Amino acid sequence: MKKKVTPYAGSKASKKAQVTQMFDAISGEYDFLNRIISLGIDIRWRKKLIQMAQKNKVEAALDIATGTGDLAVALTRTSAQRIVGLDISPGMLALGKEKVEKRGFQNTIEMVLGDSEALAFEDNTFDLVTVAFGVRNFENLEKGLAEIFRVIKPKGTLLVLETSVPTRFPFKQFYGFYAGWLMPRMARLLSKDRSAYDYLAESAVHFPYGSAFNNILSKIGFIRVANHPQTFGVASIYCGTKPTT
């Protein structure tokens, strides 16, 4: 990132600990606020990611930073026979487990508590790894991506959905107003944790999006790296493949 952004500026805790605390605090309101703040467009972005995933032969899939499980549930529309949803926040994960059970996917989806930078899986375990709005919360971005690379099978795919910043007028100017001023104020009216959405907005701005993130993926070892901007560049879907050697 351009600079280290943490949820609680005055805290001496690690970013990882702060992120866990933040998501535990907002877990009960996360889905509702996410729909309002994104104007529901995040649903369309996830559908696009799933369409990309469906082009691959997938037996085992891992959804990192699964949160309340939206993307893990959506992955049932791929060929995956085994889906693991992993999150560092017990509060978010508890809601995700409820969602999985309510939809009857408990035999397909396993929800586990875990750290994306220290994955408890063997090398070359998953055909597909997905991360939606999670990589910018990694304490060490390259370490987390290297762990993902390790657990993906050769020829396996990484798909990352993350916020980005539009570069063209007038979308860049509107995004600056929306993310920097309007979104935090909307969240403060509705959220118990006022600083959480300040952090989410600021971390989006400072995330190395576009070609900068492509370069990091290539550095880690991924090939056929590409990014696909969504909705005028407000978000991007990144893809990369693990080579056979």
Give the location of each predicted region:
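N-terminal auxiliary segments of SAM/dcSAM-dependent transferases
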Residues: 1-20
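Hydrophobic beta-strand segment of the Class I
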Residues: 30, 129-130
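Class I SAM-dependent methyltransferase SAM/SAH-binding core
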Residues: 60-118
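A short acidic, Gly/Pro-enriched loop at the edge of an enzyme's catalytic core
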Residues: 117-128
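A short glycine-rich, Lys/Arg-flanked "PGG" loop and its adjoining helix->strand segment in the class I
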Residues: 142-157
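Core SAM-dependent methyltransferase catalytic element
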Residues: 220-245
